[in-house]
């Protein structure tokens, strides 16, 4: 009898260990950028992986080598098939990933977006660096701080005509220009397609085509340094170069005076927040508008309605977490940041 009881206890222990191992294995989160090899996304990935270690969750950072729907869909499908139970993706297209993401959700995978959103029905929570009016407004204000002419010529230059986040910011920026700077002329809107060489060529082409250009607004991590390098190559120090990129990439241009102001947010914290939110979804099942989470070294973040991003779609377990702050970098503060 004693032997039988011991065998049963041993069996229960083995089953408990098996269950614990299965649960631990299931706590895997994939963190996907638009593409690898770009400092902005690498920094976000570092924040995500560090958060995973702090939480005891396995976080994998991986992305395509080129920004494409097909590349991201392949990664999403691979992660789902490998048993990952949460995916956080910076989407190259608002709709192109939706079929794959909806299939993943039907299989019980938690889907979140960061940096660049999908249509809201294709994910649960979007970890958002700022609303379109916040970021579009930053772009115009940085240019206006440097352009003193009433009748100025301005070019927009960023990654692609289909990427969600940047097009939302640019729309708001153009609306703000029309309302507050009606005499500014937007002479062109061009794209570098996340390619460093093409971005430099495009930026040089813009400067050559408009010898009297007053500003380039470049809300893209590749486009902004390319515009700054093009201005240096062509000795066009009279053009205001503003936009979004990381301080480590832009530091030399700020130190040389080519760029007076540029903006961003703490993308390391964005990666960290993304993983904390994903982990909370794995524990609770969902998060709803009004729910809050206290994240170490960052503070309290709150789920807000999709309408802050201009969406009409609202649903249970669906919303947006907006980063607490954004930063304008200048020569006076850039050395306080290292990412």
Swiss-Prot record:
User: CDD domains, alphabetically?
Assistant: PBP1_LsrB_Quorum_Sensing (cd20003)
Signal sequence, start to end: 1-25
Principal localization reads periplasm
- CC annotations in GO: ATP-binding cassette (ABC) transporter complex; outer membrane-bounded periplasmic space
Looking up Pfam families in the UniProt record yields: Peripla_BP_4 (PF13407)
Q: Keywords of this protein's UniProt record, alphabetized?
A: Periplasm, Signal
Domain of life of the organism encoding this protein:
Bacteria
Q: Which InterPro entries match?
A: Bact_Solute-Bind_Prot2 (IPR050555), LsrB (IPR030159), Peripla_BP_I (IPR028082), SBP_2_dom (IPR025997)
The family note in this entry says: Belongs to the bacterial solute-binding protein 2 family.
Quaternary structure, from the entry: The complex is composed of two ATP-binding proteins (LsrA), two transmembrane proteins (LsrC and LsrD) and a solute-binding protein (LsrB).
- Family annotation (PANTHER family): ABC TRANSPORTER PERIPLASMIC-BINDING PROTEIN YPHF, D-XYLOSE-BINDING PERIPLASMIC PROTEIN
UniProt-recorded name of the protein: Autoinducer 2-binding protein LsrB
List the source organism.
Photorhabdus luminescens
Q: What is the lineage of its organism?
A: Bacteria, Pseudomonadati, Pseudomonadota, Gammaproteobacteria, Enterobacterales
